[in-house]
Amino acid sequence: MKITALIHDCSLDGETGYAATCVEFPEANGQGESVEDCLNDLRAAVSEVLTYRRSSIFETLAEGERLETLQA
């Protein structure tokens, strides 16, 4: 799966490091001293969002519904 990261250089705000938000999953954010660290943190956040969404969907399945995993 490919995701889009919006990366902010925090030095423009007088701070250090970088912050990123995932365009497709705006609740997933990352930060780090380098762009690489920031993106790794964002990847982990996206993974956590997906894990949470997948686990919580089981609570809403109606009788006769099932989940299938697809490769996007």
Annotate each PLM feature.
Residues 1-6, 36, 40-72:
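Short, charged, surface-exposed hinge/linker loops at domain edges
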Residues 3, 24-26:
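Short amphipathic alpha-helical segments
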Residues 7, 21-22, 30, 64:
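Short stretches within intrinsically disordered, low-complexity N-terminal or propeptide regions
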Residues 8-24:
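Short aromatic-glycine-(Arg/Gly/Cys) micro-motifs in beta-strand/loop hairpins
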Residues 10-11, 31, 43:
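Intrinsic disorder/low-complexity detector
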Residues 26-37:
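A short, exposed loop/beta-hairpin motif centered on an aromatic-Gly-Thr core
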